[in-house]
Structure formats: C-alpha cells, structure tokens
Amino acid sequence: MLETTIRNKLAQKDILLMTHIVIGYPDLDTSFEVVRTMVEAGVDLMELQIPFSEPMADGPVILKANQDALATGITVDECFDFAEKVAAAYDIPFLFMTYYNILFKYGVEAFAERMAKCGLCGAIVPDLPPEEADDYLAAMNKHGMAPIFIYAPNTTEARMQRIAEHGKGFIYCMARKGVTGLQTDFSGQLGDHLDHCRASTQLPLALGFGVKDRADVEFIKGKADIAVVGSQAIRVLDEGGVPAVEAFIRSLR
C-alpha cells in the first residue's frame, strides 16, 4: 500500500523526494537512464507522465517534453511497457501522471487493471475531480491503486476534506496557482497553506510546483512530507545530460 510505504520511508528520513519524468523524452532509452540515475541518487518515489497533447497543468518545460515525446510516435502501450520495466527494476513506488482523456480512450477499468499488472502504485490525473470520478475511483480501488488528488492554494478547507475522503496514498499540494515550473515564493504564506492542508487530512502531503533547489526542500521539511521536483530536473537534463541529473538530485538534501 502506497501510504504505508511512504510512512515507512518517513520513519527514516525527514523529507522524501519525488521526481517527475515524461516517458519517452527525449527517447525511451534516455528515459530509462534518467530513472536509473534518479533512483541511484536517492529518489524515494517517481511520477511517470504519459505524454498528452494538451497537458493543462504543465508549464513550458514539461509541455515541450510532452510535445517532443509525442513527436517520436510514443504510444500509451509503450508507456505501460516502460512502467512495467522500471517497476520491475527498481524498488521504489512508481505512479502514472496523465490526463483523463488518456484513461477515457483506453478504458478506465482496463487502465487501472494494467497499472496493477505493471507494478505501479497509483495515479495523478489533474483534470479529474473526485466528484466526476466514480468509475475511476471504483476501478482504482478494485485493483489496489491509489488515486492521488490535488489541493490548490484556493481550495477551501471544506473542499479539502471532501477531496481527502476520496484520495489514497498522499495528497498533492500545489505551491501556487497556475502551471508547473514557474517561480514559487517559498515563504510564510505557503507555510500557512500547508498548515491548512495538514489540518484537513491524515494522508501524507506532497508539495510541488516550483521546487528547484535544496533551500526549497529545506523550507518544505516539517510542513509537508514529500518534495516534488519536475520541471527543474528536465531543465538540468536538457542542459547537462543524464550525469547532471544525478548531481542535481544529490544536491537537494
């Protein structure tokens, strides 16, 4: 169970690292090398994004990675094969991140079933609110997968509690409104937001959107349980290749 795995890791570390890759960017072989490098550098769990043409929650860095991966002709089936390969190779939790159109076209039940067979632990689907997710929730629960839901800075406390009733594994907290990869003000206001998040759920909290260096990770310690690094890792890959990714991950804590 994902939550149990996270809590066991938190008994040994004061903050966990979750990274985000776009499957097939820049190609499948490099994607596998990035996963290997991140795991060896100490990443605790990882989001594997299935490329999509209109990734509404993602900023320019991850948007470009989605577009470039799609331009190679990558398919959803290839993404499942990749996920199965990395889940078999490395003993950390892997999650899918994608958009509902992918699940709808594949078939929600079939998608959840294949996730389980591949050894995945759960999924983040940013454009699917729990009120519209009955089929998804039923399929995820049936196959032992954790549906991860999102708290935004403007989510009311009452709504946070409703979301938490449906979520499993952890809650993904956005550090700010907007899309991924832009500048985030890691300050007292964000700390207050995380206090509200913590009060609304017993699930572990992950914080993403703008986490880029050790100072940001240090700020998150004691306020959330998981620091999520996405766009910055892709920037580092673009600028310095796979070896630079290892150095970057090791620099975060």
UniProtKB/Swiss-Prot annotation:
Record pathway: Amino-acid biosynthesis; L-tryptophan biosynthesis; L-tryptophan from chorismate: step 5/5
GO cellular component terms, semicolon-separated: cytosol
Protein keywords: Amino-acid biosynthesis, Aromatic amino acid biosynthesis, Lyase, Tryptophan biosynthesis
EC number(s) recorded for this UniProt protein: 4.2.1.20
Coiled-coil boundaries: none
Pfam short name (any one): Trp_syntA
Reactions the enzyme catalyzes: (1S,2R)-1-C-(indol-3-yl)glycerol 3-phosphate + L-serine = D-glyceraldehyde 3-phosphate + L-tryptophan + H2O
Active site per database record: 47, 58
Source organism, top-level taxon: Bacteria
Listed PROSITE patterns: TRP_SYNTHASE_ALPHA
GO MF entry, a single one: tryptophan synthase activity
Subunit structure and binding partners: Tetramer of two alpha and two beta chains.
Function: The alpha subunit is responsible for the aldol cleavage of indoleglycerol phosphate to indole and glyceraldehyde 3-phosphate.
Assigned protein family: Belongs to the TrpA family.
Official protein name in the record: Tryptophan synthase alpha chain
